[in-house]
């Protein structure tokens, strides 16, 4: 994934934070005596005194303007309507001597070179991080987009079916005869319906019936001789 490109405001802020090149804070200076009213622009500082000023790069020699030393510094910088050839010659002579200073030219060259280098680096960074730049398209070809599709299959096991319970056989229950009311006789009050209760269940015999000798003897056939003898012995 490409890094986000720096915005224009960020680049402007970086350029503002760079140190200014030499001569950016120049001053107006009056190089020769009080009679000379032609000001000269100094790239670094104006040094000397109010009556004798010259350009220099040493901040310790910089002239300090105040009302005691130079009560009217601005009036001395007024340009006359007509310039004499002597004034022009002296100004050109001072400019040629100032231009021959190698330190001031070297500082300006270094400042310009650093500024161009910073702008070049910022341009390269923008081109390699911005997708709309030609260098980005040449160095970083577009990759095909591969879409991975994952399919998840869920298998549901059948729930166990409950075993059928055996059904008990149904026996026919006892039938009860309903109560049939009698029609009321004329002049007789109607009797209330009696409460019907179901008949009690017949108790099942728990054992064989008791043995009775009389009943056992009566059940024997009359032609049995044993039966006849038993009757004779009974008092």
Curated annotation (Swiss-Prot):
Compartment(s): Endoplasmic reticulum membrane; Nucleus membrane
In the induction comment, the record states: Induced in a p53/TP53-dependent manner in response to cellular stress.
Q: What is its main location?
A: endoplasmic reticulum
Could you tell me which residue ranges are on the Extracellular side of the membrane? 27-105
Q: Which Pfam families match?
A: Shisa_N (PF13908)
| Topological region Cytoplasmic | 127-235
Q: Which residues cross the membrane?
A: 106-126
Keyword set includes Cytoplasm:
no
Q: Which residues form the signal peptide?
A: 1-26
Q: What is this protein called?
A: Protein shisa-5
Q: Could you tell me which species this protein originates from? A: Mus musculus (Mouse)
Task: Tell me the name of the encoding gene.
Answer: Shisa5
